Amino acid sequence: MSQPITRENFDEWMIPVYAPAPFIPVRGEGSRLWDQQGKEYIDFAGGIAVNALGHAHPELREALNEQASKFWHTGNGYTNEPVLRLAKKLIDATFADRVFFCNSGAEANEAALKLARKFAHDRYGSHKSGIVAFKNAFHGRTLFTVSAGGQPAYSQDFAPLPADIRHAAYNDINSASALIDDSTCAVIVEPIQGEGGVVPASNAFLQGLRELCNRHNALLIFDEVQTGVGRTGELYAYMHYGVTPDLLTTAKALGGGFPVGALLATEECARVMTVGTHGTTYGGNPLASAVAGKVLELINTPEMLNGVKQRHDWFVERLNTINHRYGLFSEVRGLGLLIGCVLNADYAGQAKQISQEAAKAGVMVLIAGGNVVRFAPALNVSEEEVTTGLDRFAAACEHFVSRGSS
């Protein structure tokens, strides 16, 4: 018989780039998880905005099993039916004319930045290579995307970094305007900064970026890795703003827990990419595509998207009630089911401690930096699960406050 797996095994065997919780989940259903000891958790973390339909959704399992019984992989010398169906669904539902599939948000953003550089190179010349991104952004962990991210703590130890990337202040169109010029090939922005604290962009800011990109012949890239696939109550967050990007990246919820990412592009942008200019071995594989196709089918409905907006109200109303009782937060913000509770000055820097108390109470939440407790639950989380989970979160807040901040 094999040895039991324990949390200590992680510290023995894994490269230590993560610091996971002390418990190991072993089973999930809907918005509930159970650990090795059988303890139940209400999951408001959603695998960091990935598990858009909860755990072990029966229709996703069916889609995966059906494709798994046929074939798993061929490589990109061949196409397959599930990926073509998925591409058509994304094209029909968005501004895009073309799609490139990959395995993660970082890969999708890498592809977008490469496409933008090539578009400018082919059309205007090699001098037009500048990328403008934003402070406190997050676009992934490849060297290119982590450099674009605007958080030096993630990139400073990996120098020399890719050149010609500058960072403006988020939600500050004057700061962006000072950096965007005729040497700029692209501007990359999150409609809501997720890792940066759940900070929604203003409408004027995104409209201003669109106008600046038009003026300087730069591509506008929306990183919707975290905000996409129904998370905000629209299929993609750009739909809230009436601002259409040239390129859009999507991943996380697109696979509902199965790894998949995509770059959506207009025909004009896609045309610069020819055979051999980019690729990835597993991109568009039939397993991921079959699952993602079912995810889109289930999420892109008025009932589901309106339900996200309703659930937003459930969360915000109850979180404000909790805050009225314990006085932890200066603000509750976000769109749809991407919600951030900003700690007030008395509790600054202690979001991690609150998330740990929450886990002890049987509810999983996220953080977004040291000052924001983040919620990214399944889009179909039930009212009972919201009530139970927030009861547990309230108990965690009470315990945190009663023991005193430290």
UniProtKB/Swiss-Prot annotation:
The keyword Transferase applies. Its cofactor is pyridoxal 5'-phosphate. Pathway: Amino-acid degradation; L-arginine degradation via AST pathway; L-glutamate and succinate from L-arginine: step 3/5. It is an enzyme of class 2 (transferase). The modification N6-(pyridoxal phosphate)lysine is found at K252. It catalyses: N(2)-succinyl-L-ornithine + 2-oxoglutarate = N-succinyl-L-glutamate 5-semialdehyde + L-glutamate. SUPFAM superfamilies: PLP-dependent transferases. The keyword Methyltransferase does not apply. Induction: Its expression is under nitrogen control; a nitrogen-limited medium highly increases succinylornithine transaminase activity. Keywords: Aminotransferase, Arginine metabolism, Pyridoxal phosphate, Transferase. Its EC number is 2.6.1.81. It comes from the Bacteria. InterPro entries: Ac/SucOrn_transaminase_bac, AcOrn/SuccOrn_fam, Aminotrans_3, Aminotrans_3_PPA_site, Class-III_PLP-dep_AT, PyrdxlP-dep_Trfase, PyrdxlP-dep_Trfase_major, PyrdxlP-dep_Trfase_small. GO terms for biological process: arginine biosynthetic process via ornithine; arginine catabolic process; arginine catabolic process to glutamate; arginine catabolic process to succinate; ornithine catabolic process. Catalyzes the transamination of N(2)-succinylornithine and alpha-ketoglutarate into N(2)-succinylglutamate semialdehyde and glutamate. Can also act as an acetylornithine aminotransferase. Is involved in the utilization of arginine as a nitrogen source, via the AST pathway, and also seems to play a role in ornithine catabolism. NCBIfam families: arg_catab_astC, argD, PRK01278.1, PRK05093.1, PRK12381.1. Belongs to the class-III pyridoxal-phosphate-dependent aminotransferase family. AstC subfamily. This is Succinylornithine transaminase. It comes from Escherichia coli (strain K12).
